[in-house]
Amino acid sequence: MISHVLVKDTSCLKVRTSYKCFVKYFPKCSVQSSFHSYDELAFSRRLYNLPRTLLNSRYYSNHSHGLVHGSKSPPSSQFLVPSFLQFNGQLKALCNNSAFQALPIKLSDLQKHWPSLKPHPLPPKRVSLGIPSISNPPVDTVISDSPTSPHPPSFVQPHPPYGIFAAPILDVRVLTNPGAVKRTYNLCLDISKYPLLEGKDWKIGGSFGIMPPNSDAEVLHLAHLLKIPQHELYVTKVLRTNGGRWPTIWGEDKPRCLYTSLYHIFKWCSDFISKPPTKSLIRLLAEHTLNPVEKSVLLALSDFRQDESYCRICTQSCVTLPDILEAFPSCHPPVDHLISALPQLMPRWYSISNDPSLANKRLEMAFTVQEYHSPNGQSRTGICTGFLEDLALAFLKARHDGSLANKKFTVPMFRGVQQNPFAKEFHNDGPMCLIGAGVGIAPFRGFVQRRLANAACTGKVWIIQGCRDQKLDELYHGEWNTVPGHHKNPKCRAKKLVVESRNGRREYVQDAVRRHGDVIWDVLSHKNGRIYLCGSGNSFVSEIEKALMDVAMKYGKLSKEEAQKELKNWQKPMNCKLIKEVW
């Protein structure tokens, strides 16, 4: 019995409208479909209006042995698409779906795995949702859904015993000028009522956590894609977990029974936007996809050996769960199993940009809005920076309108352990050089304030600040030699160099390090001299380290091997001459 028929030459198919999408994605592939007789093949040819060449093909595969009639093995260029003719309409619909077209998925990349898929195993189901057995389930009074003062459920515990504190916003400043590539803001928060434990304080150079929510628009959009009625989002459910820390973040590892709603789970506990879907999650989506073609593509994406298309999903187009659901509309995963497979929505950490000991219970922080584009080209912002910008703009608007006194603006934040490198290794003596790019310069503002206010300080301070254009995005311009509300030590002055990458010299901070290598070497050679480095990306750090090695070779007369060894010594805890914070 003939079970599969192969078409050797697909060039004749290109004239058929129904096969344009197939030829587009499989230009060198043959077609295979399931038939039980020659008559069935002929009927299907007439039904689908296929060329007669299909009937004349001499290439038949044997279902039981996987061989092609007339040869020992199929041509290497052939790709077997299971039951293609049966699913021709579904394939065309998938390829014509604009959401699918926007994804960086090439069906030709999947061809080598399709005949023998090894999909990722299904993720375990750790969560169940039910209806409360009591008529009046307890209400979490901590929750606030106010757009300007949002607060998560009480079970969200990013750092026990510290709860999440609603810190009032006292002031907002825009640090960049119109025309800057990125927007950067400075927030001033009131921490006078923060419940600090005995013996704890806020450290200069420290960082604190912010618990951002997913936006209501994103939550409602996800619910729409999952076919969840909007009113169902707000119905109180019994959430049971079989172990782990979720949804508390860092609470005790144990089973839980909580009263909550899908709205609060999606808003505060599940990260479905900032990270690409894992293969485990894609496998779950494939399991609950009705359309056979969509199911096959998702299964192929979850294959252990599939790297090309999946890597593009992770690195090129910022693909999210909603993007996948839009591209594969027949996918309807169970909500409880989906929640089990989604990562926890985690807090974001921000450096303190002032000296807390001089600020009268006020913390300042700077943030740059992270922007990227969705697969279809729409602009998106990072979960936390987008959330903070919305708060900042609403605050500025209320202040402009004169309605600030009637509104409450708060940020959900918590102290954390204050054990980041800058908090542990700030020293108030000896010369220091502060090197930062972009918003990485923010924690050094507090360093300089501490030095300027210290009457006994005689150590010199050098600042190398990297930006694109000094006129547009130099942060804290004119603030580096002042201490608000305090007298400045006249003997101490910070010397600052602004490095522009798109104007002036068009150089980067590592170029300035080499150009001022004599100053850098003087700092490193001093007994108490230290260099602090802050920025984003490992490439930033590696370039600075290369520049420091060049300085050591030029001014310290060291060989390359000796400079490499010295670079490692500077970073050892016992020496602590090069302190880095990178994100």
Curated annotation (Swiss-Prot):
Return one GO MF term: FMN binding
Domain FAD-binding FR-type positions: 162-424
GO aspect biological process, one term: methionine biosynthetic process
Q: Sorted alphabetically, which keywords does the UniProt record give?
A: FAD, Flavoprotein, Mitochondrion, Oxidoreductase
Q: Does the keyword Zinc-finger apply?
A: no
Query: In its keyword annotation, does this UniProt entry include Iron?
Result: no
Q: Where in the cell is it found?
A: Mitochondrion
The protein's required cofactors: FAD
Q: Which PROSITE patterns match?
A: FAD_FR
Any Pfam family hit: NAD_binding_1
A single Gene Ontology CC annotation of this entry is:
cytosol
State the family it belongs to: Belongs to the flavoprotein pyridine nucleotide cytochrome reductase family.
**PANTHER family in alphabetical order:** METHIONINE SYNTHASE REDUCTASE, NITRIC OXIDE SYNTHASE-RELATED
The protein, known as: Uncharacterized FAD-binding protein C1783.01
